[in-house]
């Protein structure tokens, strides 16, 4: 199964609580922190809700 590398590129300051919860749930903390997650429907749905805050690329 493929994996996605998700990098937080914008701060969650001033964002709604549901977006903050998604960022925290993915394991992202500070700006420029990255995490590798499985490429499945649940992760893609979470990433879609915060796509303006993160950068996503295929992990090698």
From Swiss-Prot:
CDD domains listed in its UniProt record: Ribosomal_L30 (cd01658)
GO cellular component, one term: cytosolic large ribosomal subunit
Organism superkingdom: Bacteria
GO molecular function terms attached to this record: structural constituent of ribosome
Claim: Ribonucleoprotein is one of the keywords in the record: yes
Claim: Electron transport is one of the keywords in the record: no
Disulfide bonds: none
Keyword entries, A-Z: Ribonucleoprotein, Ribosomal protein
GO BP terms in the entry: translation
Subunit architecture: Part of the 50S ribosomal subunit.
Family: Belongs to the universal ribosomal protein uL30 family.
Descriptive protein name: Large ribosomal subunit protein uL30
Taxonomic classification: Bacteria, Bacillati, Bacillota, Bacilli, Lactobacillales
């Amino acid at each position: 199964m493929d994996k996605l590398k998700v990098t937080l590129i914008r701060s969650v300051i001033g964002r709604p609580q549901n977006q903050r919860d998604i960022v925290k749930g993915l394991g992202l903390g500070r700006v420029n922190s990255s995490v590798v997650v499985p490429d499945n429907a649940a992760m893609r749905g979470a990433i879609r809700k915060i796509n303006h805050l993160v950068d996503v690329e295929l992990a090698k």
